[in-house]
Curated annotation (Swiss-Prot):
It comes from Dictyostelium discoideum (Social amoeba). PANTHER family: GLYCOGEN PHOSPHORYLASE, GLYCOGEN PHOSPHORYLASE, LIVER FORM. May provide energy to overcome environmental stresses. GO terms for cellular component: cytoplasm. This is Glycogen phosphorylase 1. Coiled coil: none annotated. It is an enzyme of class 2 (transferase).
Length: 853
């Protein structure tokens, strides 16, 4: 069941194009609105002050930094909305094929700086605010990061949306408007603590609540079959109803009118308040349904260790796709009557398996609500959807109990059985009598508890499946889904990830941005990163080398001040900044890093003063969150902080080594850390990281990688040259044999690592029993092969130290890295998706209003 609830005064036309009669009725309105808002300093100042007075209801006597930020944000939003309206109207009139990017996460970071830069209003806002007594950079700090994501998946989606708007592709993102982020991380006694991240505490000036866009989403209920001369028809009714309310966030393209949209859904009760229950004295029951409905979009990734947690996660996923598909279909129906046109006008990208139930939901709507036949409906579905796989880790490939889906989404489970039945007929035609193939490929995993394999459903229901790095895509084809690849080789592609250079160079590193513009003689590199290759022509120029070092030093000084303010630790900005920032997970091997730090500490302690004089000073920086239920990862955080406490208070090594764990890592913090990094750690066990995007951000900013040949590191090595990185460790092809050796106790622990273990066991870094499970996991299992890679890792770290002593050579390698990153721009990635998966074309908005672009 789906209903649009338009307000009377905002009723929409069938096509979205205003008819001449309406224009005549509102001729005064059209006469008044013939231009965009003015962007001179006086106009901007007036708009800011008007919002402070009329939107915030504050006076000029109560005009502090936060109200200045809010007033500025609302004034920028006004300008965004103008462009947004122009863009959507233009798309409606031209009717291009659109892509809808479905993602459970959008890790947007802060929006004020991004919007001002993209709309080319940096100087105007800087000067306007300066006259009002505010530095624009200070106001950026007033904004709280939108807590709509957790890690790389959400940040990738944000970069992609930026590129789609910049490249003028007609695209919308869809997701959920979480009231709380995953959690706000603190550190207490070295342990991670978690408190709710209520990021909306002061409101969100960037979103537009769309009370005229609501859809009803159903859960539970019953399915009844009604037979007629035309055949059987299935109706899903009763159950629990929840309202989906739309919230829009405009996404500006860079120096273009084109402004796309991210539409997020918030859950509200279908029936706001049970008055009968209240009047009957049942006060808790009166609000119970309201609370249950609102829980759906309360928290990003609720803990799914319990049945109720699993149910809530699946509710989130279905609520998300059900509302989204209602919206997509409504938009399609405004100007199209023939369902065969749907795949020619709509492309839907599934960002990982979370939105996969949308495959079945579209199928259900076509069959049950639109009356299409099975084959016709399924053909439309498979031509519409495409699926991006982001992992090869088995535990990350989602599966849901059949019993849960039968209870929560009974009609969908019926359809999944039917889809699987027809799919397995294809399998038997390819491999007659091969039960093993049927069992391995089936959407439903048999066993004591039957489960639906969401990745299998996504592959079966999509016309294209892509990995996110060359190595990852090969593993997807030959290791994760080899039988699917054998069945449908034409479905599988690689689309290496990318990041936006606008945020990660121009905004995060204005000094480097200025260098590029000066030495290239143009600022066009912001939208054509291939131009940056030209900087290599000047890499031997002493002036460029001096500027490069100056900018890096300034970024390191800024990070040192940040660390002092937020961590209370003094660090030397002249030291080598060694950075490891990402989600805390065993496969990402923060453990390998901290074990090497312990060895470095023990080595320095044993050195003579003469030997210490040769030591390269280091600041080792960690940041990242562990999932609340991931006990081992949280132990790793405890070990890092315990080691940091011992090292940082040891005056004997004070000038040679510091260790910092920066809590509550987010996009804004990354924008401070990344430009200041000298080396960055990309040390996952070979064959475990799908791609990674932090490696791309660091490389763009001239930070050298120490890492394994895993994920996108492989392609970075191809672009920058392996000689300009510090590569170590087992290769993917060697991992299985290495694990076999570990299982058979054929691995000797390096004496240096034995010394590290001994010091942990002796309590050098805290009570040994706290860290005993970590040591046991290494000695008796070591699935991620830290023991075998440890000596190779130390050798690579020694190479880092040696190169650092030759600063001229170091800077040249830094320049080569930064100048070789065109392939890792999200612009390149989006062009490939558009041409090879979605079949969409740019649609540059030609506005009737005067504009500066």
């Amino acid at each position: 069941m789906s209903t649009t609830i338009p307000l009377k005064h905002t009723a929409r036309t069938t096509t979205g194009v205003v008819p001449p009669t309406e224009k005549k009725k509102g001729s005064k309105l059209f006469a008044l609105k013939t231009d965009f808002l003015k962007n001179d300093e006086d106009s901007i100042q007036k708009d800011i002050l008007d919002h402070v007075e009329y939107t915030l209801a504050r006076t000029k006597y109560n005009f502090d930094s936060f109200s200045a930020y809010q007033g500025s944000a609302y004034s920028v939003r006004d300008r965004l909305i103008e462009r947004w309206n122009e863009t959507q109207q233009y798309y409606t009139e031209r009717d291009p094929k659109r892509v809808y990017y479905l993602s459970m996460e959008f890790l947007m970071g802060r929006s004020l700086q991004n919007a001002i830069y993209n709309m080319n209003l940096k100087d105007e806002y800087h000067n306007a605010l300066l006259e009002l007594g505010f530095e624009m950079e200070d106001l950026y700090e007033e904004e709280k990061d939108a807590a709509l994501g957790n890690g790389g998946l959400g940040r990738l989606a944000a970069c992609f949306m930026d590129s789609l708007a910049t490249l003028k592709y007609p695209a919308w993102g869809y997701g959920l408007r979480y009231n709380y982020g995953m959690f706000e991380q603190g550190i207490y006694d070295g342990y991670q603590t978690e408190v709710p991240d209520y990021w909306l505490v002061a409101g969100n000036p960037w979103e537009i609540e769309r009370l005229d866009v609501q859809y009803t989403v159903r859960f539970y209920g019953q399915v009844t079959e009604k037979k007629s001369s035309d055949g059987s028809k299935f109706e899903w009714d009763h159950g629990e109803l929840v309202q989906a309310i739309a919230y829009d966030t405009p996404v500006p393209g860079y120096h273009t009118t084109n402004t796309n949209n991210i539409r997020l859904w918030s859950s509200k009760p279908h029936k706001e308040f049970d008055l009968d229950a209240f009047n009957g004295g049942n006060y808790l029951s009166a609000v119970e349904a309201k609370q249950r409905s609102e829980n759906i979009t309360s928290v990003l990734y609720p803990n799914d260790n319990t049945y109720s947690g699993k149910e809530l996660r699946l509710k989130q996923q279905y609520f998300f796709v059900a509302a989204t598909l209602c919206d997509v279909i409504r938009r399609f129906k405004k100007s199209h009557q023939n369902w065969q046109d749907f795949p020619n006008k709509v492309a839907i990208q599934l960002n990982d398996t979370h939105p996969t139930i949308g495959v079945v939901e579209l199928f259900r709507k076509l069959i049950d609500e639109e009356g299409l036949q099975w084959e016709e409906a399924w053909d439309i579905v498979t031509k519409t959807f495409a699926y991006t796989n982001h992992t090869i880790l088995p535990e990350a490939l989602e599966m849901w109990p059949v019993s849960l889906i039968e209870d929560l989404l009974p009609r969908h489970m019926q359809l999944i059985y039917g889809i699987n039945h027809r799919f397995l007929i294809q399998v038997t035609q390819k491999w007659p009598g091969d039960i093993g193939k049927m069992r391995g490929l089936s959407i439903i995993q048999e066993g004591e508890e039957k489960r639906v394999r969401m990745a299998h459903l996504a592959i079966v229901g999509s016309h294209c499946v892509n990995g996110v790095a060359a190595m990852h895509s090969e593993l997807v084809k030959h290791k994760v889904f080899p039988d699917f690849f054998c069945l449908w080789p034409e479905k599988f592609q690689n689309k290496t990830n990318g990041v936006t250079p606008r945020r990660w160079i121009e905004q995060a590193n204005p000094g480097l941005s200025a260098i590029f513009t000066k030495w290239l003689g143009t600022d066009k590199w912001t939208t054509n990163l291939e131009l940056v290759k030209g900087i290599k022509e000047h890499m031997d120029n002493p002036e460029l080398i001096a500027e490069w070092k100056y900018v890096k030093q300034g970024n390191k000084q800024r990070l040192a001040e940040f660390i002092l303010k937020h961590c209370g630790i003094h660090v030397n900005p002249n030291a080598l900044f060694d950075v490891h920032i990402k989600r805390i997970h065993e496969y990402k091997r923060q453990l390998l890093n901290i074990l090497s730090v312990i060895y470095r500490y023990l080595s320095i302690k044993k050195m003579s003063p003469k030997d210490r004089a040769q030591v390269v000073p280091r600041v080792v920086i960690f940041a990242g969150k562990a999932a609340p239920g991931y006990v081992m990862a949280k132990r790793h955080i405890k070990l890092i902080n315990s080691v940091a406490e011992v090292i940082n208070r040891d005056k004997e090594v004070d000038q040679y080594l510091k260790v910092v764990f920066i809590a509550n890592y987010n996009v804004s913090i990354a924008q401070v850390i990344v430009p200041a990094s000298d080396i960055n750690q990309q040390i996952s066990t070979a064959g475990t990281e799908a791609s990674g995007t932090s490696n791309m951000k660091f490389t763009m900013n001239g930070s050298l990688i120490i890492g394994t040949l895993d994920g996108a590191n492989v392609e970075i090595a191809e672009e920058v040259g392996q000689e300009n990185m510090f590569i170590f460790g087992l290769r993917t092809s060697e991992v299985e044999a290495a694990r076999e050796k570990m299982t058979n106790k054929e691995v000797n622990i390096d004496p240096r690592l034995q010394e590290v273990f001994l010091n942990i066991e002796l309590g050098t870094f805290g009570p040994p029993d706290v860290f005993r499970p970590i040591l046991d996991s290494l000695i008796f299992s070591d699935f991620y092969l830290s023991i075998q890679d440890f000596p190779l890792y130390l050798d690579s770290q020694a190479s880092v130290d040696e190169l650092w002593k030759d600063q001229s050579a170091w800077v040249k390698k830094s320049i080569i890295n930064s100048a070789s990153t065109y392939f890792f721009s999200s612009d390149r990635a989006m062009n490939e998706y558009a041409e090879q998966i979605w079949d969409i074309k740019p649609c540059e908005v030609e506005t009737t209003l005067n504009r500066r672009y």
